């Protein structure tokens, strides 16, 4: 019984800024951008992975979450304490330069890690940590 990832979620505090980053800087395609019941359902994904969607959603969008929980999540996001995703690339250095040129907030320049990847890190416009890895070998 094989299991595959289909969808993951990244908390964003501004859909338009997030779309500009994930679409225009990272090169992900917009798969859905639908408004309903006061919410906005936005999904993006890598063109090379048509079966994997990333949902860009408000922090703790669960309608059953308390206002205190929502405030706590928004605070963690604002502090940049949420790790969102690790993306694989075939050229970490070129990816780094592309994201830096697009205005990404640099957290770590490309370095070789002892566990077999070349790695760099940025924050997205909402404060999420995103890592970009190139397998070595």
Give the location of each predicted region.
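Short acidic-aromatic low-complexity motifs
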Residues: 12-16
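Short Gly/charged-rich anion-binding patches and loops
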Residues: 17-18, 94
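Vicinal oxygen chelate
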Residues: 1-9, 29-123, 133-137
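Conserved active-site tyrosine of GNAT-family acetyltransferases
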Residues: 18-23, 99, 127
């Amino acid at each position: 019984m094989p299991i595959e990832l289909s969808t993951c979620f990244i908390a964003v505090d501004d859909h338009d800024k997030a779309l500009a980053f994930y679409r225009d800087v990272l090169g992900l395609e917009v798969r859905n951008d639908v408004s309903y019941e006061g919410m906005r359902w936005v999904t993006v994904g890598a063109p090379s992975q048509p079966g994997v969607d990333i949902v860009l959603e408000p922090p703790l969008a669960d309608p059953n979450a308390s206002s205190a929980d929502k405030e706590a999540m928004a605070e963690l996001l604002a502090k940049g304490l949420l790790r969102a995703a690790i993306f694989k690339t075939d050229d970490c250095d070129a990816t780094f330069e592309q994201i830096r040129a697009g205005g990404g907030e640099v957290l770590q320049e490309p370095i070789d890690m002892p566990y077999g990847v070349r790695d760099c890190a940025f924050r997205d416009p909402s404060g999420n940590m995103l890592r970009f890895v190139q397998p070595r070998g």
